[in-house]
């Protein structure tokens, strides 16, 4: 694309159309941009639109499009074309910083994100001047520019908070500190001075406090991995100023908004985080400053209101206290009973209260409430912080803390009992306090795994939880009922089984609750209970125990999906999946009705897939329906095809990218259930599966390969007879896959199925070309993964067509090549083959080479006979060689960037491991002994002579054992 006004105008028009609410206008525009983004100058044109357009909306749209383009395409992935030309990369890096700093804030944020994406790949090695260019802008004195630099630096450096330690990381952080730490400190001091100068200018203060917050975030990132020498030397400057800012109260910066945190709250929140980091990780160096921070943060907590805008500040302040009280260094600060009582009364109990804002979220923003409460994204909530503080205090003072809090729990429950209708929030806080007190260790899988022995969880369940679960009106007091359900879920590993069984039918009844939170919690609790393990690796709750409630459970789960707000509730769908899995054949009578409901739901969500987890569990539930029903009666497979194929056809025709990989997996499962034939409906689809466009998306590759394997397994003869013109297309797919380090193993899966199932004559003309392609890949890019797959393939070929055919095809490509492959690949590398089936294939293939290939006995290949036998005995007896060369680098499929749908494996569509040799060989060691006996009978004296002169003693001893086990001997 040329850099000219015409192209700028065209691009502007298409960007405008991507903003249209009409899909008929929007989608073609999106497709057009997708089709041209591979052209040189495309990103430069986007930046030109961003810079020159008079329309602010178009400028922002261009910035967002540019950022997403960078996100998808900047990383260079091995085996894949470079999607951005080198001149474009250079031009982007030369211009983007200046463009970002001179743009309005909305655009600045997008470009700042783009810089951090580029920086993640290129900084510092391929973009060495980035930091210097940014630091130089500190001198500008323009805080719009300075904040742009700080924002970009923050997005660039925040990954230091969660990266694993490595020499490469240390080198990068050292470079950043050497260039950035001193200017950042000077800027920090200068900004604080300016705050004092402009103490009465609200507009100036807003900009300056934004800067201070960003500077504080950078401090956190740069200090996270280790305490840098520079910051240790300058601790006085940073900590004194942090403390002053923490105690600052400027009326101008206070906001009337009760929801949104103001600049002062955001800054103080970050300073609490910074202090907590130092208290936790660098307690020795931080000790002189700790008492004044404890005092300042304590004062902050007891003087800050209950408004939502203070939530982040209060939770970070409490987290600071939690991190301090857990450290043995600071234990003395909390030993006094009065201190513990004061913390409980003034900090913990007030911040555990269920506020009107929480009630609003529970009723009107249930999805966010659930994510926060169930999935642990409540990291910034007051309740979570208060709970962490309770746990921290219990580390050293479990007895006193439990005693103090038990008094509060009892008084809260007494208040509730006086007037439940008015005082229900007291019981809510009591349950939360008990949960905090009792929880010592928790996992997603098991709930609470270690509990405070001073809290009787079972007694609390009987006295206070069961009554809410049993309440005949499921819609009364939804918060308390949700609390009760969550209590069962949280303490499921601590409560006795009889109490859990008592809870199950009650939880089933709560699936009917109108409250989204309540019926979601009920579904989630049931799903978690159904995954608990009992003795002998079985489920704790058995299908027999569920029998009285099975119909009600399935009915209520599917009805819950019809409650407004829960039509795509992932917790309900996961509970459906888990119920199917637990109940197994008990669901068969209900499937004719339920499959219609599942299919209808699939049709609806395929119009606009927006809930990936819901969709995944929906497909898992379909797979379970198919597996369980067809296990009992394989003939029912046709009724599933009848129900599902119309929806599948629509999904494939509309190219619903998120669902296509799932459809292929379910089709594979269905096809694999058929006896050895392919129905015509599948054969009609076969040519479409070979279209190159389908194979462009990495997420399609594993399920498509499996589906093609199912076609070959069930109908290779039919393909050879009626669709032989498609065999080149099938091999074209293999050729594409084999060229990629990420997908070569998938290419071998396909090739092995072709060799195993296709009639020999159907692929004779292609065999030589297949081997040539494999050799070209071996020469150009040999990896351990490829070699292992190659070994399995050539040995399968030996098993299928015979060792002579294998030797001849190698030597036909190039004289003596067979010997080279045996010597350079098979003998040294076979020890690396992993997997029982793979090892068996290699063993049987090598046995055939040793005993059924005359060239191994009568030509220059004879010298390889004993080493090959030794390698085979090593495969049987030695541990697997899992070493990988130092310089080898595998591309992980999940690591490939971009917006493509990643492959999501359906657990319940799982394919059974296939053994192409099967029962024909049960023990390869016995087969070796029998085959050597047969060979020695054909040429007496030769085999013992070769063994005695060339095989090491240890290998001979193993071989002797095989011969004895097979009751044969060599002659």
Curated annotation (Swiss-Prot):
* Subcellular locations according to the entry: Cytoplasm; Nucleus; Apical cell membrane; Basal cell membrane
Report the superkingdom from the record.
Answer: Eukaryota
| SUPFAM superfamilies from the UniProt entry | ARM repeat
The record's keywords, sorted A to Z, are:
Cell membrane, Cytoplasm, Membrane, Nucleus, Protein transport, Transport
The annotated consequence of gene deletion is: Morpholino knockdown of the protein causes strong expansion of the gut lumen, due to excessive fluid accumulation.
Record GO biological process = body fluid secretion; protein export from nucleus; protein import into nucleus
> Which InterPro entries does UniProt cross-reference here?
ARM-like, ARM-type_fold, Importin-beta_N, XPO2_C, XPO2_central
Gene Ontology molecular function? nuclear export signal receptor activity; small GTPase binding
An example Gene Ontology cellular component term from the record? cytosol
Expression sites (tissue/organ): Detected in larval gut, liver, exocrine pancreas and part of the brain and retina at 96 hpf.
Q: Note the topology in the membrane.
A: Peripheral membrane protein
The UniProt record lists the keyword Metal-binding = no
Where in the numbering of this chain does the Importin N-terminal domain appear? Answer: 29-102
| Role | Export receptor for importin alpha. Mediates importin-alpha re-export from the nucleus to the cytoplasm after import substrates have been released into the nucleoplasm. Negatively regulates fluid secretion and plays a role in fluid homeostasis by down-regulating cftr activity.
Concerning its family, UniProt says:
Belongs to the XPO2/CSE1 family.
Q: How does it assemble?
A: Interacts with cftr.
Annotated protein name in UniProt: Exportin-2
């Amino acid at each position: 694309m040329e850099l000219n006004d015409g192209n700028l105008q065209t691009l502007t028009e298409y960007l405008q159309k991507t903003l249209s609410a009409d899909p008929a206008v929007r989608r073609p525009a999106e497709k057009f941009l997708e089709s041209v983004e591979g052209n040189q100058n495309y990103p430069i044109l986007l930046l030109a639109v961003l810079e020159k357009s008079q329309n602010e909306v178009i400028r922002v749209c261009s910035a967002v499009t540019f950022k997403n383009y960078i996100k998808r395409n900047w990383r260079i992935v091995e085996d894949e074309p470079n999607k951005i030309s080198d001149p474009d990369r250079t031009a982007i890096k030369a211009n983007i910083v200046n463009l970002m700093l001179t743009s309005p804030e909305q655009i600045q944020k997008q470009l700042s994100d783009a810089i951090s994406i580029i920086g993640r790949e290129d900084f510092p090695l391929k973009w060495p001047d980035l930091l210097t260019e940014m630091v130089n802008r500190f001198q500008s004195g323009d805080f719009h520019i300075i904040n742009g630099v700080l924002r970009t630096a923050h997005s660039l450096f925040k990954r230091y908070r969660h990266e694993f330690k490595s020499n490469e990381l240390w080198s990068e952080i050292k470079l950043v500190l050497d260039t950035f730490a001193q200017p950042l400190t000077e800027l920090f001091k200068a900004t604080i001075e300016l705050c004092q100068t402009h103490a009465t200018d609200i507009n100036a203060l807003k900009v300056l406090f934004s800067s201070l917050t960003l500077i504080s975030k950078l401090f956190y990132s740069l200090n996270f991995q280790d305490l840098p020498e520079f910051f240790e030397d300058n601790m006085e400057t940073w900590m004194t100023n942090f403390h002053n800012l923490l105690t600052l109260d400027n009326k101008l910066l206070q906001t009337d908004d009760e929801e949104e945190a103001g600049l002062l709250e955001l800054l103080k929140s970050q300073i609490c985080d910074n202090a907590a980091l130092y208290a936790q990780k660098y307690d020795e160096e931080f000790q002189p400053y700790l008492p004044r921070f404890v005092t300042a943060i304590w004062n902050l907590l007891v003087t800050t209101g209950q408004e939502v805008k203070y939530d982040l500040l209060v939770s970070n302040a409490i987290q600071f206290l939690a991190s301090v009280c857990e450290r043995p260094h600071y234990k003395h600060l909390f030993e006094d009973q009065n201190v513990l009582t004061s913390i409980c009364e003034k900090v913990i109990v007030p911040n555990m209260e269920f506020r009107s804002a929480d009630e609003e979220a529970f009723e009107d923003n249930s999805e966010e409430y659930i994510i926060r409460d169930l999935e642990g994204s409540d990291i910034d909530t007051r309740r979570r912080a208060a709970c962490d503080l309770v746990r921290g205090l219990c580390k050293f003072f479990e007895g006193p803390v439990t005693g103090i809090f038990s008094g509060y729990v009892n008084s809260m429950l007494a208040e509730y009992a006086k007037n439940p209708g008015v005082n229900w929030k007291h019981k809510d806080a009591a349950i939360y306090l008990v949960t905090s007190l009792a929880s010592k260790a928790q996992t997603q899988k098991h709930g609470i795994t270690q509990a405070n022995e001073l809290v009787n969880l079972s007694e609390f369940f009987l006295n206070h939880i069961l009554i809410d679960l049993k309440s005949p009106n499921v819609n009364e007091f939804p918060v308390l009922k949700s609390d009760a359900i969550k209590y069962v879920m949280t303490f499921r590993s601590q409560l006795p089984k009889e109490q859990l069984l008592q809870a199950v039918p009650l939880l089933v009844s709560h699936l009917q609750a109108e409250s989204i939170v309540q019926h979601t919690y009920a579904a989630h609790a049931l799903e978690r209970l159904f995954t608990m393990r009992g003795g002998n690796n079985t489920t704790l709750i058995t299908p027999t125990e569920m029998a009285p409630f099975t119909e009600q459970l399935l009915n209520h789960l599917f009805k819950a999906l019809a409650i407004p707000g829960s039509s795509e509730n992932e917790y309900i769908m996961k509970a459906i999946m888990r119920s199917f899995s637990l109940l197994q054949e008990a669901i068969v009578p209900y499937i004719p009705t339920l499959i219609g409901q599942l299919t209808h739901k699939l049709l609806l969500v395929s119009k606009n897939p927006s809930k990936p987890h819901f969709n995944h569990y929906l497909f898992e539930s379909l797979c379970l329906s198919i597996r369980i029903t067809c296990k009992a009666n394989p003939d029912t497979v046709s009724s599933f095809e009848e129900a599902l194929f119309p929806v599948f056809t629509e999904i494939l025709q509309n190219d619903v990218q998120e669902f296509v990989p799932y459809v292929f997996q379910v089709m594979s499962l269905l096809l694999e259930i058929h006896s050895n034939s392919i129905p015509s409906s599948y054969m009609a689809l076969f040519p479409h599966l070979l279209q190159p466009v389908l194979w462009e998306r990495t997420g399609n590759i594993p399920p498509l390969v499996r589906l093609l394997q199912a076609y070959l397994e069930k109908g290779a003869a039919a393909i050879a007879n009626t669709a032989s013109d498609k065999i080149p297309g099938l091999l074209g797919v293999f050729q594409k896959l084999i060229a990629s380090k990420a997908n070569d193993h998938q290419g071998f899966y396909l090739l092995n199925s072709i060799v195993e199932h296709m009639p020999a004559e159907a692929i004779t003309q292609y065999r030589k070309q297949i081997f040539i392609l494999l050799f070209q890949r071996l020469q150009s890019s040999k990896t351990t993964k490829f070699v292992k797959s190659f070994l399995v393939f050539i040995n399968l070929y030996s098993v299928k067509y015979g060792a002579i055919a294998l030797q001849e095809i190698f030597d036909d490509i190039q004289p003596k090549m067979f010997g080279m492959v045996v010597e350079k690949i098979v003998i040294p590398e076979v020890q690396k083959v992993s997997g029982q089936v793979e090892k068996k294939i290699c063993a049987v293939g090598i046995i055939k080479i040793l005993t059924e290939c005359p060239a191994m006995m009568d030509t220059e290949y004879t010298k390889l006979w004993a080493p090959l036998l030794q390698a085979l005995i090593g495969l049987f007896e030695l541990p697997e060689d899992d070493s990988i060369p130092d310089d080898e680098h595998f591309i992980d499929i999940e690591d490939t960037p971009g917006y493509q749908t990643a492959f999501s494996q359906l657990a319940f569509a799982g394919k059974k491991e296939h053994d192409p040799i099967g029962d024909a060989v049960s023990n390869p060691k016995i087969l070796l002994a029998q085959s050597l006996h047969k060979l020695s009978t054909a040429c007496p004296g030769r085999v013992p002579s070769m063994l005695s002169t060339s095989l090491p003693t240890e290998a001979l001893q193993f071989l002797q054992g095989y011969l004895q086990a097979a009751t044969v001997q060599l002659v």
